[in-house]
Every structure is written in structure tokens, then in C-alpha cells.
Amino acid sequence: MKIVADENMPYVEALFADLGEVVMVDGRTLTQAQVKDADVLLVRSVTKVNKSLLDGCDRLSFVGSATIGMDHLDLDYLKQRGIFCTNAPGCNAVAVGEYAFNAMLELARRFHNPLKGKTVGIVGAGNTGTALQKCLEAYGVKTLLNDPLLEQSGDEREFVSLDELIERCDVISLHVPLTRDGEHPTHYLFDKRRLNALAEDTWLLNCCRGEVIDNRALIEVKQQRSDLKLVLDVWEGEPLPMPELVPLVEVATPHIAGYSLEGKARGTFMLYQALMAQLGRAVDKSLASLLPPLWSHQLSPLSVPDEKALLCLVRLVYDLRDDDELFRQRFQNNKGFDLMRKNHKHRREFSALMLANTAGSDVDWLLELGFSGVGL
């Protein structure tokens, strides 16, 4: 079996080498000749998989993309050819959820306004929104969900309207895809009217797509309302954010909320699982075994007395302030936004930090938050 894979996908050799010959290629410049005798093709979103690439590739039976979306795959053509295709939905969901939770703790610390006791509204209850909800519920924070599409699909969770969520919530975090059509378009979902409707001292976080918020309107509203606190990981007009918006934002990063080492590795691992299922073989490797340890030792926390202590624990895994500072220094440089993303040192997720003897203790809720427990 010949496996052709994008050279920027991690752990391909470790996961797939036992199955056959692995050839790593540049996904941006991949040619038909490189794929011609492949049985398996593993790509990222930079590779367009269509007839022009695969015509004449008679051996190919499996295409996997280590991405959330599939818009770079010609699904009709692959179906016509009988080529199995899959992707990695939700591979970065934990990273995005933890980023948003982390940002809330940073705001709470900076403005002496505790997260505990607030009501957090999550707009978009798919993979990333649900990951955030898991963090918040582990910490004992009340959440409200808005997702009309999931509500209509029969999702049994309780949902509220967007206007009700805006009225009732102290914190609002956005986790929707960008859509311009249909019954519930999300383009400029938060326009000037909705931004003006935000309650006093609201925290607004956007970790999905920049154009879900009208950034020009956001500038106007924020200039009049210093009470609003903003966390933006995504920007209208990326990779060129509106320069007058950045100084108005409390936490600013270059679309890296989903950039964790675990998330990147999870994308590759999900394709490995799918291929093993197609081959009718048992999965004999684990994601955890691939990842390097965060530290060589473990922590044994006896208590987490307040949010300051919790934030200190979170910062041991990822200090959001570093990315915020770098973004402010470089976002106006030519290609600075893209270079920050390309050269980003993928952070770790909470699970990388091992906590000893926490089960049944006063801090066992940290396991629900996502930290790993040993000596249970």
C-alpha cells in the first residue's frame, strides 16, 4: 500500500508506516504524477482534490483530509469514482473551547470581575461551542445556548432565542459557521443593532469567523461603550484586520484559537482510525502515546481556592497573554497575520498537564475541566 500525505501533517509516519510505504509531499504543489500510484491520499485544506488531480489514479481508494471542512474536496467526483473520503470534524474543538474559557479567566483577572456567578451565552452549539460549555459547566458557570439549526434538528438540549440570550447573559461567545444564505444566515449576525443591545459590562468573544460581527459597527459601538470587553481571535478582512479596531480589543490573537498540538495531531489520528476501519483492522495506537509530555513531573494540587489560582494553573499550559502581545506588535506588518499563524508554536491543551491523586478530592472537578489525572 502506498500512502501519500501532506508534509505538514504531524505523526503520519508514526501512525501509517506499519501499513505501507509513506511518501510526504508539499500539499500546495501536489501533482497528478505524485498521486498516480497511491492507494491512500492524506491532505489538508491547501490541496484541491478533484478530477484534475486524480484522473488516471486508478489505485486510489481512500482520501482523508485532516480538516473540519470538506469544501476543498470534490465529493461528487469522489463518489462517482467510488473513492471513500473522510475528514476530521471537531479535531480542534477542545482547543477552541479552552481558548475561550482561558480568555474569560484573563478578563476576570484583569478587571477584577469574577467569571464565577456570571451567565455565559454560547451562540452556536456545535463541536466548539459544546467544548466551551463543558469547561464552563465543570467550573460551575451557568450557560445558555442559541442554535436554531440544531434546535430544529431535534437536539434535545434547551435553547433560547438570540435576543433572549443577549438580554440574559453577561458573557457571549460566538461559535457559528459563516453563512450568507438560508433561514439563519450568520454574516453580520452581530450588527450595530445587536451590538447596541448588549447589556452593560458584557464580554463578547468571537472564536469562529470575523464577519459574524460587523467590525466597522463594532468600532463605533466600542468607542462609545468602554464597558464592553472584547476578545477577538478572528477578524473581518483577514489577514488585514481594521487597524483602528485592534487597540479597542482586550484580547487579540491571529485566528489561532484552534491551534493546539493535540488538535493538530487529532486530525491525523482521526484519519488513521477511519482508514483502519475501512481496512477492517483494529486500532493499535493511541493519540496520547504520540504526544510529548508537557513536563517531566506532575502536580498534586490540594485546592484551587479562587479564580486567580485557577488562572495560574491554566497559564502553566498556555499563557494567552503571549499571543496577544505578539499580535499587537506584528499585525500591521506586511504578511504579519499569516506569518504569525504559520509560525505559531502550537500550544497544549489542558489534558497535557498531569494532576496526581485528584479523584475524589476537593479538586476532582479539574478532571471534568479537561486536565489529566494520574494515580486515580
Curated annotation (Swiss-Prot):
Enzyme Commission code(s) on record: 1.1.1.290
InterPro entries associated with the record: D-isomer_2_OHA_DH_cat_dom, D-isomer_DH_CS, D-isomer_DH_NAD-bd, Erythronate-4-P_DHase, Erythronate-4-P_DHase_dimer, NAD(P)-bd_dom_sf, PdxB_dimer_sf
Pfam family, one: 2-Hacid_dh
Signal sequence, renumbered to the chain: none
Protein name, per record: Erythronate-4-phosphate dehydrogenase
Catalytic activity line of the entry: 4-phospho-D-erythronate + NAD(+) = (R)-3-hydroxy-2-oxo-4-phosphooxybutanoate + NADH + H(+)
Keyword presence, Translocase: no
GO cellular component, as recorded: cytosol
Source organism superkingdom: Bacteria
Keywords assigned: Cytoplasm, NAD, Oxidoreductase, Pyridoxine biosynthesis
GO molecular function per UniProt: 4-phosphoerythronate dehydrogenase activity; NAD binding; protein dimerization activity
Gene: pdxB
Binding residue positions for NAD(+): 147, 233, 258
Binding site for substrate: 45, 67, 259
